[in-house]
Amino acid sequence: MNGIVSRLSALSKAGLGLAAGALALIILNLALPGSSLFFPLVSLWLDLALFLLALVVLRVAGVELDLFHRAVLAGVWAAALLYAFWALGSRTFVYHWDYANYILKQYSTEAAFLQGAGVGFRFVFDSITEDYTNFISLFTEFPFCLSGKTGDDYAFCQVFSILPTLLVLLAGLVLKAGQMLRVKNRFWYFLMGLGWCITYPWLRMSAMLGQPDWFGLIFAFSILLLTLDFRFEKLDPVRFVLLFSATAAIILSRRWYLYFVVGYYFSYALLVLVSSIRTARAGHRHPAFVQLRNLMLFGLVSLAAMVVLLWPIVRHILSFDYADRYSYYNGGGMVTEIYQQYARMGLMNLVLIGMGLWYSLKTRKMPALPCLAGLEILLSMLLFTRVQTTGSQHMLLFLPGWFLLFLLGAAALAEGITRRRNLKIGFWLFTIVFATSVRCSPLTLVALPDFLIGRTVLSASPQESARDFAAIDDLTYDRKDLPQIQAIAKWIDTHCAEGEISYMIPHNMLYCPDHFKNCLLPETPINAKLAFGFSVPGVHAFPMQFFEAKYVLTADPFPMAHVNDPENEMSHKLNDLFLAVRDQYFKQVETFDMGNGTTFTIWERTAAPTRAEVDYYLSGFAQEDALYPEMFSQVAEAWLTGHGL
């Protein structure tokens, strides 16, 4: 037996170890159902299994990490650890909106697994049709379970649970592109290529804000590694299983990665088709036929299997009009999106890409690579902008294409490193330092470090001047009003008994209910005592909890910080309606000075809601009601009927 084990490869031994671990987890669950150890150990097992699968992907792709590569990766991971510790420790950020979704889901998934393994896995499975699934929660529990479980802890723990696997696959992608480009100076190419990719601000942006969406890039990079130089010359079952699994996993991680999947596979199929045509023209018709046959066979079987496996997601996509419901987030279509893509790239990265394209054209090395990357980016952009304009987290779905273009630039510099060596190394180091210093804020629109925020018109949004934008960015990224926010949260907790609620009208980046709900994480004492809020047409339903609330909170001046569409944003409309009739139904009971020019006022309801009051507020949203009656008048009528009004 020992002889058999000794003859196994390292990957095979690791696989046996994982199998033994899975058996131990089954025994633990049977012996101690609902154990608090089960979910963290499952998460650790999944992280190790995913890392092992990443190594399998590298082997199938024909990529090997030698001692030099492994040493560089260890150094990069250590630097990332220090960076995350510094970046998270140098700010006071209150997790809200999308930035709080994952940590709250992590709490909920933990609670589900404490009820038993079956309950926990069912909780994860039942979420697959939601915009935010619980799939990633399976991988981020360890080592989060060992931390203080704050929002910053959740962001920091991704360096352990996600980054190692992501780094290995990114390094593999760098090497694979280098193989295809036949780079001779592999030392500088690897350092430059990996350095530019790993320090690109939008790779880490969402992670530093509590959104582990970069988890999906593990599977995106796997797809690239398995396809870039594969032309379906033969049937490769192992490669096909890995491709199918990576595609399913990336869709489960975040549904909007579908735009990458569709854009990339279409571009890749076109590349294989062109390759087959060229092969046929060269007189090799049978190999060309085999390529197309294998491509179609894999594509059709995979598509059918994917529809069956992910039918709940497919059904939800087909039945839900995202373009209509998310129209508020569509801030200008393709023209705006192109501008944002270039703004997020930054001048130096655009120069780098330009050098890579010139290098590819000049040397005629792998013209298919920039064509594949460019077409994937363009198609994904066209598909995405039919629904909305990208936020910082959505930038991740374009990174595989952009990174391929980065690597072209790295190859161009590395191959000519002997000429103007110091200048080129200086350019590389400067861009890395500049990229590392970029502020990871919800309002970061352009890749600029702290000292340039507000000092250039490039940082201004369409709604604010550069100076105002910088002020808002400072207020939201590094909160100086946390004591006041916590004071209001404690006031609500004290004055609202079980079953009673408060309603907060402001709902924007500066102040929204989530700031007050999540200001004491991991404790959420007012989660059931403060209503969610109301702001986005097509997403937020008419707020009947406003009429049920014991207290209503508003602010003066009313916050309208960096809202997407000021004219159609709904919280300020609700506030205007409230101020016009507040004295008929409410009395002022408390005020809070937030220390930044904003004052919160708390109003207590003194008169029971009536049909006339509901109709008055509903009349202020006639336009929205005409578009979404099921979210306005129908909701109001059902509430009135249920309350005998």
Where do the model's predicted regions map?
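Transmembrane-helix motifs of polytopic, lipid-linked glycan transferases
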Residues: V56-V60, F156-K184, S222, M355-K362
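Membrane-interface transmembrane helices that cradle and orient dolichyl/undecaprenyl
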Residues: L181-K184, A220-L242, I250, Y359-K365, ...
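Transmembrane-lumen/periplasm boundary regions of multi-pass, lipid-linked membrane glycan transferases
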Residues: Y102-E110, V261-L271, F289-L369, L378-Q388, ...
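Membrane-proximal lumenal/periplasmic loop motifs of glycosylation machinery
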Residues: G89-A100, L114-L138, C157-F160, M205, ...
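Start-transfer (signal-anchor) and selected internal transmembrane alpha helices
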Residues: M1-W86, V290-V301
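Signature aromatic-anchored transmembrane alpha helix within multi-pass, membrane-resident enzymes
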Residues: S9, K13, R70-W77, F187-L191, ...
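C-terminal luminal/periplasmic domains and tails of membrane-associated envelope-modifying transferases
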Residues: D468-M504, M509, D514, N518-L645
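Short acidic/glycine- and proline-prone juxtamembrane loop motifs at membrane-interface regions
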Residues: W202-F215, G391-S392
